[in-house]
From Swiss-Prot:
The gene is IL10. GO terms for molecular function: cytokine activity. This is Interleukin-10. Residues 1-18 form the signal peptide. PANTHER family: INTERLEUKIN-10, INTERLEUKIN-19-RELATED. Its main location: secreted. Disulfide bonds join 30-126, 80-132. It comes from Cavia porcellus. The lineage of its organism: Eukaryota, Metazoa, Chordata, Craniata, Vertebrata. It comes from the Eukaryota. Belongs to the IL-10 family. PROSITE patterns: INTERLEUKIN_10. Pfam families: IL10. Glycans are attached at residues 67, 134.
Amino acid sequence: MPGSALLCCLALLAGVKASQGTNTQSEDSCAHFPAGLPHMLRELRAAFGRVKTFFQTQDQLDNVLLNKSLLEDFKGYLGCQALSEMIQFYLVEVMPQAEKHGPEIKEHLNSLGEKLKTLRMRLRRCHRFLPCENKSKAVEQVKSDFNKLQDQGVYKAMNEFDIFINCIEAYMMIKMKS
């Protein structure tokens, strides 16, 4: 019996050590996240570059969807929520509609969406970058304006995706300094 108790203790210790190793790996990936961010943003910009011309030629509107108040929310105390809501907005509302307007660019849009999902996953894993609860009025305004534009909203939102990437970058620079 003492031998089996010792065996159980060793198994328990091995399990604890393995779970500690997992936490360390997660903590390590969060420690390295800021260094990898420029690469992730470059990948987002490159993926967007593959569809940008299509949406620029289709966007016939002079107004701006992603305006200065959105950037201010990204830089302010609502930055976390603005980022989270905008990622969700692009993934759930804009990109699925965009695929319908340009089947020839569907593969590139899927790639862009996957890169955005990867960024969201990494932000959520590293809680200090995305710990939020409040709603952003600027994001609500973007969504409202998008819906008012109907079919043209997709072209406008996708044409301004680079502005969204710049907002992500501004938010992350602020978070990395704090």
